[in-house]
Amino acid sequence: MNDNKAWSGRFAEPVAELVKTYTASVDFDRRMAEFDIQGSLAHAQMLTRAGVLSETDLDAIRSGMHTILEDIRAGRFEWSVDLEDVHMNVEKRLTDRIGDAGKRLHTGRSRNDQVATGIRLYLRDAIDRIVGFVRGLQAALLDLAEPNAATVMPGFTHLQVAQPVTFGHHLLAYVEMLGRDAERMQDCRKRVNRLPLGAAALAGTTYPIDRHYTAELLGFDDVCHNSLDAVSDRDFAIEFTAAASLVMTHLSRLSEELILWMSPRVGFIDIADRFCTGSSIMPQKKNPDVPELVRGKAGRVTGHLMALLMLMKAQPLAYNKDNQEDKEPLFDTVDTLIDTLRIYADMMRGITVRPEAMRAAVLQGFATATDLADYLVKKGVPFRDSHEIVARTVKLAEVQGCDIADLPLDELREFSELIEADVYDVLTPEGSLAQRNHVGGTAPEQVREQIARWRQRLAHA
């Protein structure tokens, strides 16, 4: 029978209509069309060099593929579910256009290694774009951190006021996280950038192919060195999705803080209206929908990671149809991450800082208590003793409803005669910050140095 399939020759009846739609992937894998064409053109050039195809065949394939690519970009290409996937759609259109030369293109190649090559080309391109968007978000954070290098705010542990930091220093923590994220993506790219083409179905091919030449044409650093592994490996997709999950986790943490800081009870920041929505019933509401949705989408991306792990956990070598299910989680992860990074960079530039609210919060939580303990240690008091002294000082301030810095000197000296008038130099938020003038510290001078260091790194990234 002839069912218009590349493999229909050995079957006695056509595929059931429901099976066609159930097994087809063209509705979502068509996004790989340009990468599939790149791979096919390199394969054709290699086959010509090896003497398998003629120069006439190569010219016809190049011309046909160019026309197909134009049709796809212009939205004129008609995709067919009957042809299953992007690869067979492109091949059928090519054969219709150029005849036998199109039929020869698949020589020495299987859809197994063809698909694996297309995914790697797609993901390599996606990683390069994602790293660029990560850098863009880092730059936006630096733009907000720079004018707030000395803006006092409370640092928290257990969501309780702990010690004074600066808002710039707090933002730099996320710049550091994103820096690691970019490094992970770039490291993942090394393992993505290996060519499976030439592995054929699973055992290689009998044709005199030159895989290293194909790799060179496509910009791959190396070839996959085991044909079984080449067609069945999806580690690179899992690794990418794990790295993407970490990016989303970091942005989810920042989202949680933005939501908290924007709440009227805290009021540290305001987010521009264009990133918020209102309520259909409560006229006063301004809801931080973007950070809330980012927080939700972090779970979505992590779910894709779990889906890919479960997909691969029990597959025998080599290729199995299960692997068709790798694409939707992967594609959605790429889309979600890129959209999130782009919108986040814009949103950070739409944040208004409320320094007075931040400073007021510092003064409400005895944030300089540790500074008083350190002050006593420097006077010769063992730290555990100074800890006890300061704890009793805090109790007194609580009773009087004031900050430690508001206690008169004579009352402070009741706890230790080593306390002198210079203690007030360390009990203010600014005094506390100034003492932490070391690499990684929150002193404004250090914050400015870290901002300059990151700007230099991004300029050379």
UniProtKB/Swiss-Prot annotation:
| Classification via Gene3D superfamilies | Fumarase/aspartase (C-terminal domain) (1.10.40.30), Fumarase/aspartase (Central domain) (1.20.200.10), Fumarase/aspartase (N-terminal domain) (1.10.275.10)
Q: Name one GO biological process term.
A: L-arginine biosynthetic process
Task: Write out the pathway annotation from the protein's UniProt entry.
Answer: Amino-acid biosynthesis; L-arginine biosynthesis; L-arginine from L-ornithine and carbamoyl phosphate: step 3/3
InterPro entries to which the protein is assigned, alphabetical? Arg_succ_lyase_C, Argininosuccinate_lyase, Fumarase/histidase_N, Fumarate_lyase_CS, Fumarate_lyase_fam, Fumarate_lyase_N, L-Aspartase-like
GO molecular function (one): argininosuccinate lyase activity
Query: What's the EC number here?
Result: 4.3.2.1
Matching HAMAP family, A to Z? Arg_succ_lyase
The protein's name in its UniProt record: Argininosuccinate lyase
Give the gene symbol.
argH
